[in-house]
Amino acid sequence: MTVVNEGTADIADLIKTNYQVVAIGDGRDTTSASQTGLNNFTFQKTGQVPTIVGSTLIYNVDFTGAQIPASGVSEIGIFKNGTTNGNGTLLSRVTFTNTGVVASGDTVSFTIRVEVDN
């Protein structure tokens, strides 16, 4: 059975409402489907409401150097509302090349796209 366009748009809207926590960490391993959190949580932001384009959710999140540890960050995840310290219901996680040290007055911007496919 295929989820139709209207269904994927509705699922995207449910995700938008319920998954507004974005957390960063400095873990490096690949993401497994059974994963429930970041490898090494460092900071999170709540109330991060994505924009929906069709059935794609787009999160634009900024972290300042003061929010990023000296070890840098190399993983980011989207969590269900109510998540604390990167432990909760994980929607999606990705790893990337470590940012390295970020000056406290600088900002690192992330754009995360989550596609609800049919």
Which residue stretches match the model-derived regions?
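Small cysteine-rich, disulfide-bonded extracellular modules of the LU/uPAR three-finger superfamily
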Residues: M1-S74, N81-N118
